[in-house]
């Protein structure tokens, strides 16, 4: 891998949509996925509202808002993550749920892709050891609310 260009985020709830938001503002292409299509659409709408709020408060320009919005795409399936450079899991704080996500996700990723968890309480070492790439597994914790922190 020569650099990070595309980031996949699993979980479109409060943390996941916030992570997708800041990644897009930072210039990365973002794929956002959720197990529930309605939550995925709600997450995209939340990002749009939060970007609009940032423009209204003069935190970002309209051009920056529009560029960030264009960088975010809904991913209906983890199959869409085949070319991401980094996959960030931001699902519920339950180890069995996170492990199930990694079991499904890792075989779909490139071998050089980095896998990250947003966990705040589960052992990152234990989660990484259960994947096919413990040496490319990291903890990447964001504080809430992500777009403001």
Predicted feature descriptions by range:
Residues 1-53, 57, 108:
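NAD(P)+-binding Rossmann beta1-loop-alpha1 motif at the extreme N-terminus of oxidoreductases
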Residues 4, 27-28, 83, 110-112, ...:
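Short coil/turn connectors at secondary-structure junctions
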Residues 20-22, 44-45, 99-102, 127-129:
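Short amphipathic alpha-helical segments
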Residues 24-25, 81, 145-147:
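Short, flexible turn/loop "capping" segments at secondary-structure junctions
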Residues 31, 73, 88, 138-140:
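Hydrophobic/aromatic beta-strand patches that form the interior of the parallel beta-sheet core
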Residues 38-39, 53-114, 121-122:
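Rossmann-like NAD(P)-binding element
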Residues 114-149:
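Rossmann-fold dinucleotide-binding core
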């Amino acid at each position: 891998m020569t650099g990070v260009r595309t980031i996949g985020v699993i979980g479109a709830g409060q943390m996941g949509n916030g992570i997708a938001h800041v990644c897009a503002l930072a210039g990365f292409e973002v794929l956002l996925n959720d197990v529930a299509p309605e939550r995925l659409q709600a997450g995209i709408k939340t990002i749009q509202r939060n970007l609009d709020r940032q423009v209204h408060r003069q935190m970002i320009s309209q051009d920056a808002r529009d560029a960030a919005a264009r960088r975010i795409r809904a991913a209906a399936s983890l199959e869409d993550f085949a070319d991401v450079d980094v996959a960030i899991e931001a699902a519920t704080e339950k180890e069995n749920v996170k492990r199930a996500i990694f079991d499904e996700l890792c075989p779909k990723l490139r071998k050089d892709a980095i896998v990250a968890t947003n966990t705040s309480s589960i052992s990152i070492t234990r989660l990484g050891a259960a994947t096919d790439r413990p040496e490319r597994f990291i903890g990447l914790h964001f504080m809430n609310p992500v777009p403001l922190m």
